[in-house]
C-alpha cells in the first residue's frame, strides 16, 4: 500500500487505512490521488469518493469538507460520510428521482439552490449504491 488515508467527520474517524489510490469529488471536479502526489489542500464537494485498497474499490458518499494531501498521507475532514452498506438502495434511488424532479420544477432562485443541494446529496448516495452493485 502506498497512501495512508483518514476520513474524519465531526463525530468520529469514519475510515482509516492504507490505500493504493483515491478519487475525490472536489469543488473543481474529480481529483485522483496516488503515491507521491504533490502536496495540496482542496475543498471537497458533495459526491461519491472512491478508495482503492488491495481488496478492491470502496465507495463512500461525502457531504463536503476539506482534503489535505502530503507525504503519502491524505486527511479528509468531511461534514458527513456514508458507506454503501449503510444506505438503503431503494430509498437512495427514490430520493435521487424525487430530488431530480424537485430541481427540474424549481422556480425561484431560493428553490433552485435548495433543490440543487438536495439533489447533490441524493446523487452522491445513489452513486455509492450503484458503485456497490457494479463491484
UniProtKB/Swiss-Prot annotation:
Q: What does the record give under GO molecular function? A: ATP binding; proton-transporting ATP synthase activity, rotational mechanism
Kindly indicate whether the keyword Lipid biosynthesis belongs to this entry: no
Classify the source by domain of life: Eukaryota
Keyword terms of this UniProt record = ATP synthesis, CF(1), Chloroplast, Hydrogen ion transport, Ion transport, Membrane, Plastid, Thylakoid, Transport
Name its cellular compartments.
Plastid, Chloroplast thylakoid membrane
- List the GO terms this entry assigns under cellular component, sorted alphabetically: chloroplast thylakoid membrane; proton-transporting ATP synthase complex
Pfam families assigned:
ATP-synt_DE, ATP-synt_DE_N
Record membrane topology = Peripheral membrane protein
Report the Gene3D superfamilies cross-referenced here: 6.10.140.480, F0F1 ATP synthase delta/epsilon subunit, N-terminal
**Quaternary structure note:** F-type ATPases have 2 components, CF(1) - the catalytic core - and CF(0) - the membrane proton channel. CF(1) has five subunits: alpha(3), beta(3), gamma(1), delta(1), epsilon(1). CF(0) has three main subunits: a, b and c.
Q: What does this protein do?
A: Produces ATP from ADP in the presence of a proton gradient across the membrane.
Task: Describe the family membership recorded for this protein in Swiss-Prot or TrEMBL.
Answer: Belongs to the ATPase epsilon chain family.
Q: What is this protein called?
A: ATP synthase epsilon chain, chloroplastic
Give the source species: Stigeoclonium helveticum
